[in-house]
Amino acid sequence: MKINSPKDLDFKPGSSVFLRCDFNVPLDEFGNITDDRRIRMALPTIKYLLDNECKIVIASHLGRPKGEFDEKYSLKPVAKRLSHLLKQDVIMAKDVVGPDAKEKASKLQNGEILLLENVRFDPRETKNDEGFAKELSEFGEFYINDAFGVSHRAHASVEAITRFYDNEHKAAGFLLLKEINFFYKLLENPVRPFVAVVGGSKVSGKLQALINLLPKVDKIIIGGGMAFTFLKAMGYNVGNSLVEDELIDEALKIMAEAKRLGVKFYLPVDIVIADKFAEDAMVKYVTAQEIPDGWMGLDIGPASVRLFGEVLWDAQTILWNGPMGVFEMDKFSRGTFKISHEIARSHGIKVVGGGDTADAVQRAGDDEEMTFISTGGGASLELLEGKKLPGIAALEIK
């Protein structure tokens, strides 16, 4: 798979570039950005274009507006933060392809940046509309996609727009290339032993990824709510824990396939249980076989943390996707944070995928220790499932 990098494009001073970023950052109720990692990770591409004296028009979405202007999804806070990080003005458009954006784009000087308003304020974005994509393409003689987090979606600014650029005028940004390289190396040629740590609430969300990962890994650790479907499949009583009964057969098939392939398959051996799903719940520690009726498992227990820590100890490659428990509640955060510390301590390559997992790593204070933290939740999961992502396929040099 050959994809251009920005360094392969022939920029001249004054070249106009349409850059698709993923600035879908979390905001608090006052509209302040609570985590600017996605903005910071786009800086290498933006700075490279600035060094080449390009005129840069940036597009991004934020949240899920209903295809019309909605102040709470405006990119104004992003423009402010980006300007602060770059230490230069970022011009903010009032619309996407309307008169304000077009006028401001026409007046851009070399080394200036225009940020369009949220592309999802136009309903044609999510429909992958070719007419809208053509209008966007008129902002730049070059196109760069640096938005891994939306590259699994065939949207106008990600997929349709590439039809208006030949191979010499389109590329993946440095962040997107980094994401692709990490995940492809991980799946095609990992340094062994390769351990996957898979958590999160539901098996259904991770089923395809598990099936695709099994032949590639040496060991697999299952935690989070999805573990209870596997525990129930083994005949354990799981009380009121989250279980997808319709996937019990699939869980049995996955365990049988792991055995056939010689992949060691680990489930929690003890559980932190609660009498209700709430901060003020009563809490007990029990073995995985002894969850009483009326109680639900909300985190892995200390023995599971020790066991998983030993499994991770000699790993040369670790992929972590999905928390071990309801880490948003303090009482049920210990398992996730301790596994985060165990992974951070390991000497191998440590790749973290998925939004919740990235949040957990940051809250555990381990983000500096990880080799790579992906910016895409759904996109990284689809890569792990072995799917081709529309935004990446559209950049391939045919």
Curated annotation (Swiss-Prot):
Its EC number is 2.7.2.3. GO terms for cellular component: cytosol. Belongs to the phosphoglycerate kinase family. PANTHER family: PHOSPHOGLYCERATE KINASE, PHOSPHOGLYCERATE KINASE 1, CHLOROPLASTIC-RELATED. Substrate binds at D22, F23, N24, R38, H61, L62, G63, R64, R120, R153. Keywords: ATP-binding, Cytoplasm, Glycolysis, Kinase, Nucleotide-binding, Transferase. Pfam families: PGK (PF00162). Pathway: Carbohydrate degradation; glycolysis; pyruvate from D-glyceraldehyde 3-phosphate: step 2/5. InterPro entries: Phosphoglycerate_kinase, Phosphoglycerate_kinase_N, Phosphoglycerate_kinase_sf. GO terms for biological process: gluconeogenesis; glycolytic process. This is Phosphoglycerate kinase. ATP binds at K206, G297, E328, G354, G355, D356, T357. One of its GO terms (molecular function) is ATP binding. SUPFAM superfamilies: Phosphoglycerate kinase. It catalyses: (2R)-3-phosphoglycerate + ATP = (2R)-3-phospho-glyceroyl phosphate + ADP. It is found in: Cytoplasm. It comes from the Bacteria. The keyword Amino-acid biosynthesis does not apply. Monomer.
